[in-house]
Amino acid sequence: MDRSRVTSWQLAHRVSATEVVVAQIVGVLAGALASVCGVVWWGAVILAVVVALLAVVPIGGWSTLVWARTAWRYFTTPKVPRFRTVSFAGPTGQSVGLRWDGASVVAVVEVLPPAGSLTQITRDGFQSTHDLPTEALAGCLVQHDISLSGIDIVSHGYRAAAGTPATDVYDRLVGPLPATATRTVWVALRFDATGSVEAVARRGGGEHGASRAITIAASRVVRALADAACRARILTAPEIDSAALVISRGVDPRSLTQTWKHALLPGVCNTGYSVDPRFLSKELLAKLWVPSSLGTTVTIRLRPSANDGQVLIGAGCRITTRTMPEPFAVHGLVSMRGRHKESLLSNLPVAVSDLDAVMPMADVPVDTVRHLQLPPAGCGQLIGSDDYGHGITARIFGPGVGMVYVAGELYLAQQLVFRAVATGARVLIQTDRPDAWSSLIDSIATPDRLRVAGHNSQSDNKFNTVVFDGVEASTPRGGVTALYLYAEPSQWPGAEPDLSIVQPSAMGDRILLSTGGTSIELMLVTISSETAFIGRPRAVDDYQLAYQS
């Protein structure tokens, strides 16, 4: 049995009861019209049946009636979403951001990247040492007297960060692997004040009572995640707005526009799909992260079920590219043509209240949602391949990564730095051998992403990663990753690093990667275009040029 798939064939996307009734009415009207026009009675009956059946025929994942409604809404005046984001002081005095959408109020929890995470990546998917506790989140739909009307798990990220020559090289290096280096995960919690009158009344009633209820629910979600060894925090009002603008590339959600084929964002194309619940699996979700993009968003939607022990689940995705992409060749995706604006809004981390119909949903047992194995953060950059030829990735910079120790030759350090720059790092080099770094720095030619320290001390504060190579190590400011390069591990500082990499004898293509209490031997991998930037390791004749599937 494939436990990575959360739905069974019996949970197929069904035509709604409303669509069936409308189809019957349309069929009857067609038959009546035919009869009035002189068609024999049996011919009118046949016509009525055929028209009714055609009205519910699925095309691209939607019935003909839905396509007709989509076309009508596309060519008529679009509805402008109305919402407001406010700050609310929680019981502890913490400022909590809340987004009001009619009678619904939304709080947003951000999942923090886990420390010491490693990810094994193949063409078919990935296996991480840390997963998002999705089952625990599904259990948070009902919390004592507070019942949430929905939870959206929104993941947004990219394989490589645009802006440097390293970007395209790294994109070719990872090839068909779903190696999403940078990924932010938000959990949007929606509370319907009109559907939980007693819970609101117990907390003071009105908007204040509803605000207290959703704030308490958000705090419980943070605790539930913490109990599963997953750190998280509640966003403030400005952070909620910023999170939405990250996905919409700075466009106010209230002013989004669309064509039939994509949503309009400045200078780019934003397209997407919903997922047929029959095919929702970790393998399908992994495939959504494979195409190179400026930003990919994947949303898992959880809603209360009328059946005990079950939860309604749906999924969708959006991808932002510079030009119109080729259609996804992934079985199980549902077209969003004509409704890309709604689809984009439904993938924002604000759980818009009237867009649940955008994603087909199905009932599944609560304990099966964990089989999706959702990642809590980005996988970081490709470090090497294991003994089975699978790619191994790790984060060597960013939140939760304070110190990285590297014992090896300069080539190893430059490969790490090159890939870090490709995946979004801004690296400052402090070294006693600047000439050894000059070739790489000049080739990348992007001084705001990679340069040697000392040219402008004020701009040095804009970097999030500092490499100490042959100079006295200092303590960088908070939030900055320090990477210490030495020839031997015996030279490392005494403090415990978040991640370490050892290249025996400072040569060759074998390394030992250690993080989070796990150590694994890897082989360095590269491609010719990367070698053109950083050269080759010492004393290696037969060098592995790429990963294996």
What residue ranges belong to the model's regions?
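N-terminal alpha-helical membrane-insertion module
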Residues: 1-86, 90, 390-392, 482-489, ...
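Charged, often glycine-rich, active-site loop that binds/positions anionic groups
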Residues: 159-175
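Membrane-embedded segments
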Residues: 148-151
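Conserved NTP-binding/hydrolysis module of P-loop NTPases
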Residues: 441-450
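Membrane-proximal, solvent-exposed terminal domains/tails of membrane-associated proteins
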Residues: 171-442, 455-458, 470-471, 481, ...
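Short, internal active-site loops enriched in acidic
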Residues: 156-161, 239-242
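Conserved P-loop NTPase "ATPase switch" module shared by AAA+ and STAND
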Residues: 449-476
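N-terminal topogenic membrane-targeting module
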Residues: 54-138, 142
